[in-house]
Swiss-Prot record:
The chain crosses the membrane at residues 13-33. GO terms for cellular component: membrane. The lineage of its organism: Archaea, Methanobacteriati, Methanobacteriota, Methanomada group, Methanococci. It is a single-pass membrane protein. It comes from Methanocaldococcus jannaschii (strain ATCC 43067 / DSM 2661 / JAL-1 / JCM 10045 / NBRC 100440) (Methanococcus jannaschii). It comes from the Archaea. This is Uncharacterized protein MJ0018. It holds the Pfam family Class_IIIsignal. It is found in: Membrane. Keywords: Membrane, Transmembrane, Transmembrane helix. InterPro entries: Class3_signal_pept_motif (IPR007166).
């Protein structure tokens, strides 16, 4: 059948073409709507995502921050395109009036809701509490004043943190990085942590920490930290003030005087260089599982105690005066070298307990006090210029390498008991000085000179492999109940003599033997 096209009638092909074009147009339009802004008139209205802040009813916002000063925080851009609290800056929580918390950012103050503030952020806070759980970075300065309870937490960075702590209250700081942490009143300039204040600092890196003094019953604790420079100018004072460092490292530490009641403790801490002005009275310094590369104490005065324990290491300990101090090394700990430039106090003790070791002890010049070396179980080299003027070196239960000293005018200036030593070198015993060695094993004993009347040395119940004497001029050496493997005498002159009682000398037993000027050459 043949269809005839009437006038005005659409063909099937044309209808299908129109339908196809319609479908394509719909698809394109949907895509454009999905990707493009909404147009109202001639201007597009951009759709923005809502940020973290809450929209608030202005009439309900009533924030009162107690004694808070709005001032420059530094490095802050106060321009903000947002009307909420998406600032990208540092957040700082403070206690506001009542029981609510106030959150300060570089652009906002928030108290449950959000509100813009003009100008820069607060840096002076006298509020009751600075709360934890803050986030972000504060590149400017923060100042806290007053004796209250503060807590700073989880700020990424503070450029300069300054506060004054005395009376009572506490400050807890958990900030990853602080450029300067200074304890000082910004008005009076006074710098101390005193009274019954508690300062806790943790999880932080501090470039410089400074306080003039820590006193009273103040408690200071650093935990999980790294400090480039830690400095107290006057130091730690009495009344139970205690400073504790745990799990951290300090590059340089400068401490003022540590006096009675001002105790300092370290646990799991690595310290580069430490300088302490003086330790006075009866304070304690405790080192546990820690390391100090170089430690310098100007003077030890009174009876301070230094305790080195739990596998601690001090590479070098140096002081100008030992005084009546008590240095104890135990439990696998080591002091590699102790240097004493002079000693004018009395009864200074160096005690090495089980597993401890002091490798070298140097005393430059004369010592005028008593030094006790007790319980050394490791290799030790002791070098002392002279024991003089009331000074005394007492060695008890020591297993060591060498002891070298001279004795000037002291009754029993040197006493060695119950020890085992490789080499003992006595430079001289003069001016009525004396030395006494008992119950000791010595490989080599060297006596340079016994020159004077009253210069006396006694060996009782000793076992000496080699005994060499350079000169006995007018002094006396007594050997009793002992065994001398080899005796070598260079010279005896004047009234000098050696008295041997019930002892073996060069393999021969002598009930009594006197060696003097006339017969010494037999042992030369």
């Amino acid at each position: 059948m043949i269809f005839k096209k009437r006038k005005g009638q659409l063909t099937l092909e044309f209808i299908l073409l129109i339908l196809g074009m319609t479908v394509v147009g719909i698809v394109i339009t949907m895509g454009l709507v999905e990707k493009s802004p909404i147009f109202i008139g001639d201007k597009p209205l951009e759709v923005k995502k809502e940020t973290m802040g809450l929209f608030i009813n202005e009439s309900k916002f009533n924030l009162t921050v107690e004694n808070t000063t709005i001032s420059n925080l530094g490095n802050n851009n106060t321009e903000s395109n947002n009307s909420n609290n998406e600032t990208g800056g540092g957040y700082l929580y403070i206690r506001v009036s009542g029981s609510s918390k106030g959150l300060i950012t570089k652009d906002l103050i928030v108290s449950g809701d959000a509100k813009d503030v003009s100008g820069d952020i607060s840096k002076t806070i006298n509020s009751k509490c600075v709360e934890e759980n803050a986030i972000g970075e504060v590149y400017g300065d923060i100042y806290l004043e007053g004796s209250a309870n503060y807590k700073l937490g989880n700020l990424l960075c503070i450029n300069k943190f300054q506060t004054y702590l005395t009376g009572s209250g506490s400050l807890k700081v958990y900030v990853p990085y602080i450029q300067e942490f200074i304890i000082r009143d910004k008005n009076s300039g006074e710098s101390q942590i005193g009274g019954s204040v508690s300062l806790t600092v943790g999880n932080t890196n501090i470039n410089r920490f400074y306080v003039e003094k820590i006193t009273g019953g103040a408690k200071v604790k650093f935990k999980d930290f790294a400090i480039n420079t830690f400095e107290t100018n006057s130091g730690n004072f009495g009344g139970g003030a205690e400073t504790v460092f745990e799990n951290g490292r300090i590059s340089t530490m400068k401490l003022g005087d540590i006096v009675s009641g001002g105790n300092v403790k370290f646990k799991n801490v690595n310290i580069g260089n430490m300088i302490i002005n003086n330790m006075i009275g009866s304070p304690t310094f405790e080192l546990s599982n820690s390391t100090i590369n170089n430690m310098k104490i100007n003077k030890l005065i009174g009876s301070p105690k230094i305790l080195v324990e739990d596998s601690s290491i001090i590479n070098s300990l140096e002081t100008d005066q030992l005084g009546g101090s008590d240095i104890e090394v135990k439990d696998g700990s080591i002091i590699k070298e102790i240097t004493i430039h002079g000693s004018t106090g009395t009864n200074g003790k160096i005690f090495v307990g089980y597993g401890g070791k002091v490798e070298k002890l140097f005393v430059e010049g004369n010592i005028n006090s008593r030094i006790d070396l007790k319980g050394f179980s490791g290799l030790i080299d002791v070098s002392i210029g002279n024991i003089a003027g009331g000074g005394k070196l007492y060695v008890d239960n020591v297993i060591g390498n060498s002891i070298s000293t001279g004795i000037i005018g002291n009754n029993k200036g040197l006493e060695i008991e119950d020890s085992s030593l490789s080499v003992v070198n006595i430079e001289g015993v003069s001016n009525s000085g004396s030395a006494f060695i008992k119950n000791t094993l010595i490989y080599q004993l060297k006596i340079n000179s016994l020159p004077d009347w009253g210069s006396d040395m006694t060996l009782n119940k000793v076992n000496i492999t080699k005994l060499s004497i350079n000169e006995i001029r007018n002094g006396k050496l007594t050997i009793k109940n002992s065994e001398i493997g080899e005796l070598h005498i260079t010279k005896i002159s004047g009234k000098g003599k050696i008295i041997v009682k019930k002892s073996y000398v060069n393999g021969k037993y002598y009930k009594k033997l006197v060696i003097k000027k006339s017969n010494y050459k037999k042992w030369s």
